[in-house]
Amino acid sequence: MLVCAGTCAVAAVRGGETSDGKSTATTEGQTEEYKNWIELGIGGVITSGDRAQFEQEHRLPGDQPYGGIQDLHFEGPLGKDGLFSVDGHALWDFNDYDITVQLSKPKLGYIKAGFTEFRSWYDGNGGFFPHNDVFFPPTFPEMHIDRGEAWIELGLRVPDLPEITIRYTHEFRDGQKDSTIWGDTNLTGLPVNPTRKIVPAFRDIDETRDIFAFDALKTFGNTDVNLGMRYEHSTIDDSLNLERGAGQLPPVVPPPGAQRFITQRDVNNLDLFSGHAITETRIRDWLWFTAGYSYTTLGSDIGGSRVIGTHFDADFGEPVPTLRPFDHGFINLAGTSQVAEHIFNANVLWMPLKDLTVLTAFRYTHDDRESDSTFLATDSTPNVPPFTPSNPQGGAHPITPVPVAANASVDYNRFGQRLEMRYDGLANWLFYAAGEWEEEFGNRLEHQSEAEEAGFELLDVNEDTSLLCQKYITGVNWYPMMRLNLSAQYYHKTASYDNDINAAIHQRLAGEDWTTDDFNIRITCRPKIPACLGTLALVTRYDFVHTTIDSQWAVFSDEELLNEKQSGVIKQHVISEALTWNPLARFYLQANFSYVLNQTDTPANNINLIPNTSPTVVNFRNDYWTVTSGVGYLINDKTDFHVDYSFYCANDYFKNPAVAVPYGSGATEHTVSASITRQLTKNTRLLLRYGYFNYRDVTSGGHNNYQAHSLYSGLQVRF
């Protein structure tokens, strides 16, 4: 980001005071300390191409000026020993605001309040289909969500009394953002299986949350006790908006067409209460014990609907001439859910020897969840003669909504343990090892009433679940010389999921095993080079991760338990190098390079979609490399110059439109910035910065490409 906050360094002993707090006369030769400052800034960005993509990536508004107070700090005495302070910033056309006001008094406490708001931008573009270059412009090309909170906090800090903190917070999230649940179209030009989900979709977001928190901390001898509680009330009213059969209207297709708009509204009113108690006891300097317990209960009321119409936010019952058979939806959703969770943990830190540290931990969790809901299921059936404008041939009409009820419950117990040991008894060596174990046992029940005429079949699931996780870690740090150190680590992790299914329909996962091995090594070197070349530091790191996934399914309609099959193999190599070079006291150079090779292999890559011979699902690749660098030069005691450059490249795009939507990132990005800072006076500093951005994206067919030029100027005044 080109907007740079002003910074300041506050000395440990303020000017005009000695270390014992007594005032002294400030001489002319002493440097005056400024406790307060304000930084004013103004800037702007000129973009060409996809402005929304630039805004999403760099969180800067495009093609408009912005500015205001970039950073502010003011403090002053209040009464005899109190302190008043204000911190914040405010940028117009950026929707970035933050202010904190605090009053504090030693041996009494404080009160502070604040408000924060910031904006995140989103690009509304959907998918791109390279066959015939099919692309649907989004309903809203540029979207944003404003997030913020207003809060007040009171703290009591009276000696010999518990430290009490009370805080109230109101949070909000409001706006629109893109969704990757894309709509579909068959206007792709393919002769076989032409339908693809590439049509952009978006979400309307309207969420608020009120939080009240209370904490009390008190020390009794060698034991610290913390008690606290938290209450939350959340209100969520969001919606998903997508198209089906986009563009499929006469005369492109035969009447009546198939374009329709779906609005799925999700409503949730939630109340949460949690309480906790934590103790920390220092039995001896070499033996500590901590324990904690928390209880959380959550209740929510849900509502919503899924309505198909000729436009977004349509009312149920409006005529839809383009309605298609089996357009499922629902209305009048109502339901409740309850969650109760208990967590207990205990930890022991033991240092039996000077060079040996042992940490043990235990955690128990009990979780109980129940939910019930009812709704009216909607569906459609093909039109029959006589055909009319409101009952067109080839269209469909809605059926009478059918009531459906569903409920589910989950109950499980989870146990976790950890043992960690560290030993540094050998000179220049540190050895460590750890083991983590987790066991879970539970039961899942799901039921949904049958409504075949609306596309809902009977669902009845009863399964006992179990999980066993193990992770073993070992590592070593070696410091053979002042200018060289090495670190190596290896871990092995397994996770075994086992579902004992008592009742179900169709296909269910009966068991799955994940096995991960990770090895990484880091070398830090500061080679001795000729003094005329300054100093040099190098950090080299290599990381290898290998994961296998073995799965087993049961097909209950055939009463068959399938053989276990390796369903996935994930391999990842990460190579990185960092360099810092200071050839002169006034000059430095930093560079970082990383290369990632990541591939996921599944049996699906051997499946060909008839009549084509291309694989429907290819191995997923996420290979990319990045370069970041920076150069700084101190021109004189009042002026310094900086240049930064970053580069990103991913070449994972695979073009197989005949059988799928081409996925995989194929993008290249360059970012360059240059800044100069000038100390105008002893309390005034000026900053000028220029930035250039260039982004090219193959996956989007170039629709996400952009170039941008940014200018920013900031003036900091200390007082």
Predicted segments with their positions:
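Outer-membrane beta-barrel initiation region
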Residues: 12-80
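Residues that define the transmembrane beta-barrel architecture of outer-membrane proteins
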Residues: 32, 63-70, 93-97, 144-150, ...
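Solvent-exposed loop segments that connect transmembrane elements
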Residues: 125-136, 177-200, 237-266, 301-334, ...
